[in-house]
From Swiss-Prot:
Presence of the UniProt keyword Transport in the record: no
UniProt KW Transmembrane keyword: yes
Transmembrane segments: 3-23, 43-63
Membrane topology: Multi-pass membrane protein
Identification of the protein by name: Protein AaeX
Amino acid sequence: MSVLPVVVVFGMSFPPIFIEIIVSLMLFWLIRRAITPTGLYDLVWHPALFNTALYCCLFYVVSRLFV
């Protein structure tokens, strides 16, 4: 059970995991913007798989921080 309450925005209620998804998505965009100019994506075999794994790792870290 999550400690965070239900979030209500303009009459629509969102579960607590919605905040975690948004925070991890913002972190993902920031890290991806930082990684792209460095040329790291040239070393990655499958960029889409790398992005998915990066987002999953970030979501796990963020969800552990919120609980």
